[in-house]
Protein backbone atom coordinates (compact mmCIF):
# COMPACT_ATOMS: atom_id res chain seq x y z
CA UNK A 1 0.00 0.00 0.00
CA UNK A 2 1.32 3.46 -0.93
CA UNK A 3 2.36 5.70 2.00
CA UNK A 4 0.01 8.58 2.75
CA UNK A 5 1.24 11.72 4.48
CA UNK A 6 -0.92 13.29 7.21
CA UNK A 7 -1.70 16.14 4.83
CA UNK A 8 -3.00 13.74 2.16
CA UNK A 9 -5.07 11.82 4.73
CA UNK A 10 -6.55 15.05 6.01
CA UNK A 11 -7.47 16.07 2.47
CA UNK A 12 -9.16 12.70 1.83
CA UNK A 13 -11.05 12.93 5.09
CA UNK A 14 -12.25 16.42 4.21
CA UNK A 15 -13.40 15.24 0.76
CA UNK A 16 -15.42 12.38 2.21
CA UNK A 17 -16.97 14.60 4.83
CA UNK A 18 -17.88 17.12 2.14
CA UNK A 19 -19.47 14.37 0.05
CA UNK A 20 -21.64 13.02 2.85
CA UNK A 21 -22.16 16.20 4.77
CA UNK A 22 -23.08 17.97 1.57
CA UNK A 23 -26.26 15.93 1.50
CA UNK A 24 -27.55 17.91 4.49
CA UNK A 25 -27.65 21.57 5.51
CA UNK A 26 -27.67 22.70 9.16
CA UNK A 27 -30.73 24.20 10.81
CA UNK A 28 -31.66 25.04 14.39
CA UNK A 29 -33.28 22.28 16.45
CA UNK A 30 -35.12 23.41 19.58
CA UNK A 31 -35.92 20.03 21.07
CA UNK A 32 -35.13 16.37 20.52
CA UNK A 33 -31.87 14.83 19.48
CA UNK A 34 -30.63 13.35 16.21
CA UNK A 35 -27.28 11.82 15.31
CA UNK A 36 -25.74 10.88 11.98
CA UNK A 37 -22.27 9.41 11.51
CA UNK A 38 -19.97 7.23 9.43
CA UNK A 39 -18.76 4.21 11.38
CA UNK A 40 -15.10 3.29 11.61
CA UNK A 41 -15.29 0.36 9.15
CA UNK A 42 -16.85 2.52 6.45
CA UNK A 43 -14.33 5.29 7.12
CA UNK A 44 -11.46 2.82 6.66
CA UNK A 45 -12.82 1.84 3.24
CA UNK A 46 -13.31 5.45 2.20
CA UNK A 47 -10.30 7.31 3.58
CA UNK A 48 -7.88 4.64 4.74
CA UNK A 49 -7.95 5.03 8.51
CA UNK A 50 -10.36 3.72 11.07
CA UNK A 51 -12.38 6.12 13.20
CA UNK A 52 -15.99 7.22 13.59
CA UNK A 53 -16.84 10.44 11.76
CA UNK A 54 -19.73 12.54 13.12
CA UNK A 55 -21.86 14.34 10.55
CA UNK A 56 -24.76 15.42 12.80
CA UNK A 57 -24.56 15.62 16.58
CA UNK A 58 -27.50 16.73 18.75
CA UNK A 59 -29.28 18.12 15.72
CA UNK A 60 -26.36 20.25 14.54
CA UNK A 61 -24.25 19.75 11.44
CA UNK A 62 -20.47 19.67 11.27
CA UNK A 63 -19.04 23.15 10.53
CA UNK A 64 -17.57 22.24 7.13
CA UNK A 65 -21.03 21.81 5.61
CA UNK A 66 -22.01 25.43 6.20
CA UNK A 67 -20.06 26.60 3.15
CA UNK A 68 -21.00 23.71 0.91
CA UNK A 69 -21.07 25.74 -2.31
CA UNK A 70 -17.39 26.60 -2.12
CA UNK A 71 -16.43 23.18 -0.85
CA UNK A 72 -18.31 21.51 -3.70
CA UNK A 73 -15.94 23.07 -6.23
CA UNK A 74 -13.01 21.26 -4.60
CA UNK A 75 -14.84 17.94 -4.15
CA UNK A 76 -13.30 15.09 -6.19
CA UNK A 77 -15.30 12.46 -8.08
CA UNK A 78 -16.11 9.28 -6.19
CA UNK A 79 -13.45 6.69 -7.17
CA UNK A 80 -14.14 3.69 -9.40
CA UNK A 81 -13.73 1.17 -6.58
CA UNK A 82 -16.40 2.76 -4.32
CA UNK A 83 -19.88 1.61 -5.30
CA UNK A 84 -21.84 3.00 -2.35
CA UNK A 85 -21.54 5.12 0.79
CA UNK A 86 -23.05 4.12 4.14
CA UNK A 87 -24.04 6.43 6.96
CA UNK A 88 -25.84 5.68 10.21
CA UNK A 89 -28.60 7.76 11.78
CA UNK A 90 -30.70 7.66 14.93
CA UNK A 91 -33.37 9.75 16.70
CA UNK A 92 -32.87 9.27 20.43
CA UNK A 93 -35.40 9.24 23.26
CA UNK A 94 -38.84 10.43 22.14
CA UNK A 95 -37.64 12.80 19.41
CA UNK A 96 -39.53 12.38 16.13
CA UNK A 97 -37.93 13.23 12.78
CA UNK A 98 -39.31 12.61 9.31
CA UNK A 99 -37.32 12.47 6.07
CA UNK A 100 -37.95 12.48 2.33
CA UNK A 101 -35.53 11.71 -0.49
CA UNK A 102 -36.86 14.27 -2.97
CA UNK A 103 -34.32 13.71 -5.74
CA UNK A 104 -32.23 10.71 -6.75
CA UNK A 105 -31.23 11.48 -10.32
CA UNK A 106 -28.37 10.70 -12.66
CA UNK A 107 -27.52 13.44 -15.14
CA UNK A 108 -25.54 11.01 -17.31
CA UNK A 109 -27.73 7.93 -17.66
CA UNK A 110 -25.55 6.42 -20.37
CA UNK A 111 -22.78 6.14 -17.74
CA UNK A 112 -24.64 5.69 -14.43
CA UNK A 113 -28.23 4.84 -13.48
CA UNK A 114 -30.12 6.87 -10.85
CA UNK A 115 -28.64 6.66 -7.33
CA UNK A 116 -30.32 4.16 -5.01
CA UNK A 117 -31.10 4.03 -1.29
CA UNK A 118 -31.93 1.00 0.85
CA UNK A 119 -34.76 2.71 2.74
CA UNK A 120 -38.20 3.98 1.65
CA UNK A 121 -38.07 7.38 -0.04
CA UNK A 122 -40.40 8.77 2.65
CA UNK A 123 -40.41 7.79 6.32
CA UNK A 124 -39.26 8.51 9.86
CA UNK A 125 -35.74 8.47 11.28
CA UNK A 126 -35.60 5.28 13.40
CA UNK A 127 -35.01 5.33 17.14
CA UNK A 128 -32.59 2.45 16.75
CA UNK A 129 -29.27 3.14 15.02
CA UNK A 130 -29.79 2.14 11.37
CA UNK A 131 -27.59 2.16 8.27
CA UNK A 132 -28.61 4.09 5.15
CA UNK A 133 -26.79 3.07 1.98
CA UNK A 134 -26.57 5.38 -1.02
CA UNK A 135 -25.57 3.42 -4.13
CA UNK A 136 -23.95 4.66 -7.34
CA UNK A 137 -24.87 2.09 -10.05
CA UNK A 138 -22.47 2.51 -12.96
CA UNK A 139 -23.81 0.86 -16.10
CA UNK A 140 -20.44 -0.50 -17.17
CA UNK A 141 -21.04 0.41 -20.82
CA UNK A 142 -18.27 3.00 -21.07
CA UNK A 143 -15.57 4.91 -19.22
CA UNK A 144 -16.46 8.35 -17.89
CA UNK A 145 -17.54 10.57 -15.00
CA UNK A 146 -21.26 10.80 -14.25
CA UNK A 147 -22.92 13.73 -12.50
CA UNK A 148 -25.83 13.04 -10.16
CA UNK A 149 -28.18 14.77 -7.69
CA UNK A 150 -29.28 13.68 -4.23
CA UNK A 151 -31.82 15.84 -2.36
CA UNK A 152 -33.03 14.93 1.13
CA UNK A 153 -35.32 16.81 3.51
CA UNK A 154 -35.62 16.16 7.28
CA UNK A 155 -38.38 17.69 9.45
CA UNK A 156 -39.43 17.47 13.08
CA UNK A 157 -42.88 16.40 14.30
CA UNK A 158 -44.17 19.96 13.94
CA UNK A 159 -43.27 20.13 10.25
CA UNK A 160 -40.28 22.43 10.78
CA UNK A 161 -37.40 21.84 8.38
CA UNK A 162 -34.41 20.57 10.35
CA UNK A 163 -32.01 19.47 7.61
CA UNK A 164 -32.07 20.00 3.87
CA UNK A 165 -29.72 19.30 1.01
CA UNK A 166 -28.92 22.44 -0.98
CA UNK A 167 -30.88 22.58 -4.24
CA UNK A 168 -28.98 21.53 -7.37
CA UNK A 169 -26.22 19.94 -5.31
CA UNK A 170 -24.21 18.01 -7.91
CA UNK A 171 -21.88 15.10 -7.14
CA UNK A 172 -19.66 13.06 -9.44
CA UNK A 173 -18.87 9.34 -9.81
CA UNK A 174 -16.07 7.82 -11.87
CA UNK A 175 -17.18 4.78 -13.88
CA UNK A 176 -15.38 2.46 -16.27
CA UNK A 177 -16.33 -0.04 -18.92
CA UNK A 178 -16.90 -3.49 -17.46
CA UNK A 179 -15.92 -6.74 -19.13
CA UNK A 180 -17.92 -9.90 -18.44
CA UNK A 181 -16.22 -13.10 -19.70
CA UNK A 182 -18.51 -14.68 -22.25
CA UNK A 183 -20.60 -11.53 -22.68
CA UNK A 184 -24.21 -10.81 -21.71
CA UNK A 185 -27.08 -11.98 -23.93
CA UNK A 186 -30.72 -11.10 -24.51
CA UNK A 187 -30.27 -7.41 -23.77
CA UNK A 188 -28.34 -7.87 -20.52
CA UNK A 189 -25.43 -5.59 -19.73
CA UNK A 190 -22.20 -6.01 -17.81
CA UNK A 191 -22.05 -3.85 -14.69
CA UNK A 192 -18.92 -2.47 -13.11
CA UNK A 193 -18.59 -5.57 -10.93
CA UNK A 194 -18.23 -7.62 -14.12
CA UNK A 195 -21.57 -9.35 -13.52
CA UNK A 196 -24.34 -9.52 -16.13
CA UNK A 197 -27.55 -7.71 -15.20
CA UNK A 198 -30.37 -9.37 -17.11
CA UNK A 199 -33.54 -7.96 -18.64
CA UNK A 200 -36.86 -9.05 -17.11
CA UNK A 201 -37.65 -12.63 -18.07
CA UNK A 202 -34.03 -13.79 -18.40
CA UNK A 203 -31.48 -15.17 -15.96
CA UNK A 204 -28.19 -17.04 -15.85
CA UNK A 205 -24.52 -16.06 -15.76
CA UNK A 206 -24.80 -14.68 -19.30
CA UNK A 207 -28.58 -13.99 -19.24
CA UNK A 208 -28.83 -16.97 -21.55
CA UNK A 209 -31.83 -18.60 -19.86
CA UNK A 210 -35.42 -17.48 -20.29
CA UNK A 211 -38.02 -17.64 -17.53
CA UNK A 212 -41.37 -19.21 -18.39
CA UNK A 213 -44.21 -19.12 -15.89
CA UNK A 214 -45.73 -21.63 -15.67
CA UNK A 215 -42.67 -23.67 -16.60
CA UNK A 216 -42.47 -25.71 -19.79
CA UNK A 217 -43.62 -29.32 -19.23
CA UNK A 218 -42.77 -32.67 -20.81
CA UNK A 219 -39.26 -31.63 -21.81
CA UNK A 220 -40.28 -28.34 -23.40
CA UNK A 221 -37.63 -25.61 -23.75
CA UNK A 222 -38.26 -22.01 -22.68
CA UNK A 223 -36.94 -19.90 -25.56
CA UNK A 224 -38.11 -16.47 -24.43
CA UNK A 225 -40.28 -15.22 -21.56
CA UNK A 226 -43.57 -17.12 -21.73
CA UNK A 227 -42.71 -18.99 -24.98
CA UNK A 228 -42.10 -22.76 -24.87
CA UNK A 229 -40.74 -24.91 -27.70
CA UNK A 230 -42.43 -28.30 -27.29
CA UNK A 231 -40.90 -31.70 -28.18
CA UNK A 232 -42.59 -33.86 -30.83
CA UNK A 233 -45.95 -35.16 -29.66
CA UNK A 234 -46.78 -32.26 -27.33
CA UNK A 235 -48.39 -28.88 -27.72
CA UNK A 236 -49.95 -26.08 -25.66
CA UNK A 237 -48.58 -22.87 -24.16
CA UNK A 238 -46.63 -24.92 -21.59
CA UNK A 239 -46.38 -28.17 -23.62
CA UNK A 240 -48.97 -29.59 -21.26
CA UNK A 241 -51.05 -31.38 -23.92
CA UNK A 242 -50.11 -34.59 -25.75
CA UNK A 243 -50.97 -35.19 -29.38
CA UNK A 244 -52.47 -38.69 -29.59
CA UNK A 245 -52.84 -40.21 -33.04
CA UNK A 246 -55.87 -42.18 -31.79
CA UNK A 247 -58.66 -40.82 -29.66
CA UNK A 248 -59.00 -42.02 -26.06
CA UNK A 249 -62.44 -43.58 -25.52
CA UNK A 250 -64.91 -43.71 -22.63
CA UNK A 251 -63.70 -40.50 -21.00
CA UNK A 252 -59.97 -41.33 -21.21
CA UNK A 253 -57.37 -38.53 -21.36
CA UNK A 254 -54.32 -38.44 -23.63
CA UNK A 255 -51.25 -37.70 -21.48
CA UNK A 256 -48.42 -38.89 -23.75
CA UNK A 257 -48.27 -39.48 -27.49
CA UNK A 258 -50.20 -42.69 -28.08
CA UNK A 259 -50.98 -43.25 -24.37
CA UNK A 260 -54.23 -42.71 -22.53
CA UNK A 261 -55.17 -42.34 -18.88
CA UNK A 262 -58.43 -44.29 -18.63
CA UNK A 263 -61.44 -43.68 -16.45
CA UNK A 264 -61.61 -45.95 -13.41
CA UNK A 265 -63.83 -48.58 -15.04
CA UNK A 266 -61.99 -48.92 -18.37
CA UNK A 267 -58.65 -50.14 -19.66
CA UNK A 268 -56.85 -50.81 -22.91
CA UNK A 269 -54.66 -48.71 -25.22
CA UNK A 270 -57.62 -46.49 -26.08
CA UNK A 271 -59.67 -47.22 -22.92
CA UNK A 272 -61.90 -49.36 -25.08
CA UNK A 273 -62.23 -52.28 -22.64
CA UNK A 274 -64.44 -52.42 -19.59
CA UNK A 275 -62.77 -53.79 -16.47
CA UNK A 276 -65.97 -55.75 -15.70
CA UNK A 277 -66.28 -58.74 -18.06
CA UNK A 278 -69.99 -59.00 -17.30
CA UNK A 279 -71.82 -55.67 -17.20
CA UNK A 280 -73.10 -54.36 -13.90
CA UNK A 281 -76.89 -54.55 -13.77
CA UNK A 282 -79.70 -52.39 -12.46
CA UNK A 283 -77.75 -49.14 -12.88
CA UNK A 284 -74.57 -50.36 -11.17
CA UNK A 285 -71.20 -48.94 -12.25
CA UNK A 286 -67.94 -50.75 -12.84
CA UNK A 287 -65.29 -49.36 -10.45
CA UNK A 288 -62.46 -51.84 -10.91
CA UNK A 289 -61.57 -55.19 -12.35
CA UNK A 290 -64.83 -57.20 -12.17
CA UNK A 291 -66.02 -54.94 -9.36
CA UNK A 292 -69.40 -53.22 -9.41
CA UNK A 293 -70.70 -50.36 -7.33
CA UNK A 294 -74.43 -50.95 -7.04
CA UNK A 295 -77.17 -48.36 -7.07
CA UNK A 296 -79.45 -48.07 -4.06
CA UNK A 297 -81.69 -51.10 -3.55
CA UNK A 298 -79.39 -53.70 -5.16
CA UNK A 299 -76.37 -55.76 -4.16
CA UNK A 300 -74.30 -58.70 -5.35
CA UNK A 301 -71.27 -59.06 -7.63
CA UNK A 302 -73.25 -57.84 -10.63
CA UNK A 303 -75.83 -55.83 -8.67
CA UNK A 304 -78.39 -58.46 -9.69
CA UNK A 305 -79.89 -59.00 -6.23
CA UNK A 306 -82.55 -56.71 -4.87
CA UNK A 307 -82.59 -55.54 -1.27
CA UNK A 308 -85.78 -55.75 0.80
CA UNK A 309 -85.82 -54.09 4.20
CA UNK A 310 -87.10 -55.79 6.30
CA UNK A 311 -86.47 -59.10 4.52
CA UNK A 312 -89.11 -61.28 2.90
CA UNK A 313 -88.58 -63.93 5.56
CA UNK A 314 -88.66 -67.69 4.99
CA UNK A 315 -91.77 -67.65 2.75
CA UNK A 316 -90.82 -65.09 0.10
CA UNK A 317 -88.12 -63.92 -2.31
CA UNK A 318 -86.98 -60.33 -2.83
CA UNK A 319 -87.36 -59.65 -6.55
CA UNK A 320 -87.17 -55.83 -6.61
CA UNK A 321 -86.11 -53.27 -4.03
CA UNK A 322 -88.54 -53.64 -1.11
CA UNK A 323 -90.84 -55.94 -3.14
CA UNK A 324 -91.37 -59.57 -2.12
CA UNK A 325 -92.65 -62.50 -4.20
CA UNK A 326 -94.45 -64.84 -1.77
CA UNK A 327 -94.64 -68.61 -1.92
CA UNK A 328 -98.02 -70.33 -2.40
CA UNK A 329 -100.18 -70.04 0.67
CA UNK A 330 -98.52 -66.85 1.94
CA UNK A 331 -99.15 -63.19 1.42
CA UNK A 332 -98.49 -59.80 2.97
CA UNK A 333 -95.84 -57.15 2.43
CA UNK A 334 -93.19 -59.42 3.92
CA UNK A 335 -94.87 -62.78 3.12
CA UNK A 336 -95.56 -63.35 6.79
CA UNK A 337 -99.33 -63.97 6.54
CA UNK A 338 -100.86 -67.38 5.74
CA UNK A 339 -104.01 -67.82 3.66
CA UNK A 340 -106.88 -69.53 5.47
CA UNK A 341 -109.55 -71.93 4.22
CA UNK A 342 -107.64 -72.86 1.08
CA UNK A 343 -108.46 -69.62 -0.65
CA UNK A 344 -106.19 -69.09 -3.61
CA UNK A 345 -103.71 -66.23 -3.77
CA UNK A 346 -105.47 -64.65 -6.70
CA UNK A 347 -108.66 -64.39 -4.67
CA UNK A 348 -106.95 -62.78 -1.66
CA UNK A 349 -104.57 -60.26 -3.26
CA UNK A 350 -105.15 -56.70 -2.12
CA UNK A 351 -104.99 -53.89 -4.71
CA UNK A 352 -101.63 -52.10 -4.84
CA UNK A 353 -100.65 -48.74 -6.13
CA UNK A 354 -97.49 -50.28 -7.62
CA UNK A 355 -98.53 -53.46 -9.47
CA UNK A 356 -95.96 -55.43 -11.38
CA UNK A 357 -96.89 -56.72 -14.87
CA UNK A 358 -97.36 -60.25 -13.48
CA UNK A 359 -99.84 -58.98 -10.89
CA UNK A 360 -101.84 -57.17 -13.54
CA UNK A 361 -101.81 -60.23 -15.77
CA UNK A 362 -103.01 -62.45 -12.93
CA UNK A 363 -105.88 -60.10 -12.15
CA UNK A 364 -106.98 -59.87 -15.77
CA UNK A 365 -106.74 -63.64 -16.40
CA UNK A 366 -110.00 -65.53 -17.11
CA UNK A 367 -111.62 -67.27 -14.18
CA UNK A 368 -111.05 -70.64 -15.85
CA UNK A 369 -107.24 -70.19 -15.79
CA UNK A 370 -105.09 -71.70 -13.07
CA UNK A 371 -104.08 -69.30 -10.30
CA UNK A 372 -100.44 -68.08 -10.31
CA UNK A 373 -98.12 -69.95 -8.01
CA UNK A 374 -96.35 -66.75 -7.01
CA UNK A 375 -97.44 -63.23 -6.49
CA UNK A 376 -95.91 -59.82 -5.92
CA UNK A 377 -97.47 -58.42 -2.78
CA UNK A 378 -97.00 -54.85 -1.66
Curated annotation (Swiss-Prot):
The keyword Glycoprotein applies. Highly expressed in unsegmented paraxial mesoderm. Residues 36-175 form the WIF domain. One of its GO terms (cellular component) is extracellular region. InterPro entries: Dev_Signal_Modulators, EGF-like_CS, EGF-like_dom, WIF, WIF_sf, Wnt-inh. Keywords: Developmental protein, Disulfide bond, EGF-like domain, Glycoprotein, Repeat, Secreted, Signal, Wnt signaling pathway. GO terms for biological process: habenula development; negative regulation of canonical Wnt signaling pathway; regulation of canonical Wnt signaling pathway; swim bladder development; Wnt signaling pathway. Residues 176-205, 208-240, 243-272, 272-304, 305-336 form the EGF-like domain. Glycans are attached at residues 86, 243. Disulfide bonds join 138-175, 180-190, 184-196, 212-222, 216-228, 230-239, 244-254, 248-260, 262-271, 276-286, 280-292, 294-303, 308-318, 312-324, 326-335. Residues 367-378 have a biased composition (Polar residues). It holds the Pfam family WIF. The keyword Repeat applies. Binds to WNT proteins and inhibits their activities. May be involved in mesoderm segmentation. PANTHER family: EGF-LIKE-DOMAIN, MULTIPLE 7, EGF-LIKE-DOMAIN, MULTIPLE 7, 8. This is Wnt inhibitory factor 1.
Amino acid sequence: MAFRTPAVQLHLKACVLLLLGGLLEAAYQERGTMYMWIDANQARILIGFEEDILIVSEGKMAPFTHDFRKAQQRMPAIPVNIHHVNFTWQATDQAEYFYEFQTLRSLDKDIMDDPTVNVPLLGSVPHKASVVQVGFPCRGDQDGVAAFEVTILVMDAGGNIILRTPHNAIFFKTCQRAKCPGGCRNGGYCNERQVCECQDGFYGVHCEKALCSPRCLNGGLCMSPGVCICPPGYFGSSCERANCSTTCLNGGTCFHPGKCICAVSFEGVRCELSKCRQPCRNGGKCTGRNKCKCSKGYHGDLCSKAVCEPSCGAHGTCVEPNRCQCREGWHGRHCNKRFRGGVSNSQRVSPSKHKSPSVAAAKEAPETSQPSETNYVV
